[in-house]
Swiss-Prot record:
GO MF annotations, alphabetized: nucleotidyltransferase activity; sulfurtransferase activity; tRNA binding
Pathway assignment: tRNA modification; 5-methoxycarbonylmethyl-2-thiouridine-tRNA biosynthesis
Keyword Cytoplasm: yes
Pfam families linked to this entry: CTU2
UniProt KW keywords: Cytoplasm, tRNA processing
Signal sequence residues: none
Domain of life, source organism: Eukaryota
Compartments (UniProt record): Cytoplasm
Protein name per the record: Cytoplasmic tRNA 2-thiolation protein 2
């Protein structure tokens, strides 16, 4: 039993509470000797729990994590066609730089694959910063990669090369959803569907997603809270095979943390230009609050975030038995969880009570109430539980 009582929390605050550990900021030392190669350097990078390293030793360490993630699981076959997602975030630029470096090495060390770069334009208003100038700078720096752009919500045939792209106004379904939580979840699923369609269009067999440990920890908690527990393992795993057309999504930066990403940005003088989700953290949604919670943990208790993230590696993905045949959600492509279960029935029962209200008291018919709950559970049987929750927030129109 816990021996800490209320008296232990006096005017001095939580005396026995967990104390903040190492921050994620790290230290850049102006000059000194590298603890790994022994050479003098004008700038040393001091990561938490690692000795100070010179510019080249740090880059070798970070790039090894990228190569090790792909090599340990043998997830990327030789001469694979890869679609790399660049959204302007720091981690996406790090992944782009690492992949370009791996492709420009000698034959022995070269990563043997062909890469194309995709940017999904999700600007909701013309007043937002135009990403095209920054993308053109990246195209020149990382030649000969081909850069493609497509608008979120557009048809796949509207995919354009960066040099030929011009934005147009589209009618967005997410504006028809009542809550910000539902809108953000829908945009995430819509984005995944579009990525899979573009990969098929460009004949790419693999997609590189720039997710790091802290973002995957936030995604794990968010998926559980949204009712996606059956597919949470694939949401944070190195390999996700739910995209259409047997396209495989890979997360080769999953072992990098925020501190390593920021040091890499500084070392390579990269310029992130994304300001979308991170700027919305003041708006209340389940995703934003979870991200803020994990960011605070990462700042004060970095090892706790690692524990949350590593939990995802121990969760097995829920799969349909082979004899039952494939049965996936029409929106998120996860295995359907809409079978009759006590938990889902209880949720729909509660909703039915709220809907019937006074009529329930007048009729006093519990059988009708349970029948109503079963009908709700069996309706939209092509959607999983979480995607049905999105549909419930839809004011008009259709999700798909």
């Amino acid at each position: 039993m816990c021996s800490i009582g209320e008296d232990d929390f006096g005017d001095e605050g939580a005396t026995h509470a967990m104390l903040p550990g190492s921050s994620t900021v790290g230290t850049v030392i102006t000059a000194g000797s590298c603890n790994k190669c022994g050479l003098n350097s004008l700038e040393l990078y001091k990561l938490n729990f690692r000795a100070a390293e010179c510019h080249q030793c740090f880059l070798s360490y970070a790039r090894h994590k990228f190569r090790a993630a792909l090599g340990a699981a043998k997830a990327l076959p030789r001469n694979a066609e890869v679609l790399l997602l660049v959204d302007g975030s720091a981690e996406s630029l790090v992944l782009l730089d690492m992949l370009h470096f791996a492709q420009t090495q000698n034959t022995f060390k070269r990563l043997h694959c062909s890469a194309r770069v995709l940017h999904i334009d999700a600007q909701s208003s013309p007043s937002e910063n135009d990403p095209l100038p920054m993308l053109n700078e990246l195209r020149e720096r990382y030649a000969p990669f081909e850069f493609y752009v497509i608008q979120l919500g557009a048809e796949v045939h509207s995919l354009k090369l960066l040099k030929d792209y011009s934005a147009s106004r589209l009618d967005s379904t997410d504006n028809k959803l009542r809550s910000l939580t539902a809108r953000q979840d829908y945009v995430r699923q819509q984005r995944k569907r579009l990525i899979g369609a573009v990969a098929l269009q460009l004949q790419c067999t693999h997609v590189f997603e720039p997710s790091i440990s802290s973002s995957l920890a936030a995604q794990l908690l968010t998926s559980v809270a949204l009712g996606r527990g059956g597919s949470v393992a694939l949401d944070v795993a190195l390999l996700d095979d739910r995209l259409q057309g047997a396209v495989t999504l890979l997360r080769p930066l999953k072992d990098l943390n925020e501190q390593e990403v920021q040091f890499y940005i500084k070392a390579q003088q990269l310029k992130p230009f994304r300001s979308d989700e991170s700027s919305l953290l003041s708006d209340a949604s389940l995703q934003n609050l979870t991200s803020a919670f994990v960011a605070n943990l990462q700042l004060n208790y970095a090892s706790t975030v690692s524990t949350v993230f590593r939990t995802g590696d121990k969760i097995a993905a829920k799969r349909q038995p082979i004899e039952e045949g494939p049965s996936t959600c029409a929106l998120c492509q996860s295995d359907l969880d809409s079978g009759l279960s006590d938990t889902l029935l209880a949720i729909e029962y509660s909703r039915a009570v709220s809907e019937m209200g006074v009529a329930l008291q007048q009729q006093n018919n519990m059988e009708a109430l349970e029948q109503r709950a079963r009908e709700r559970l069996n309706s939209m049987d092509n959607l999983c539980h979480a995607c049905r929750n999105i549909h419930a927030e839809l004011t008009h129109g259709s999700l798909i």
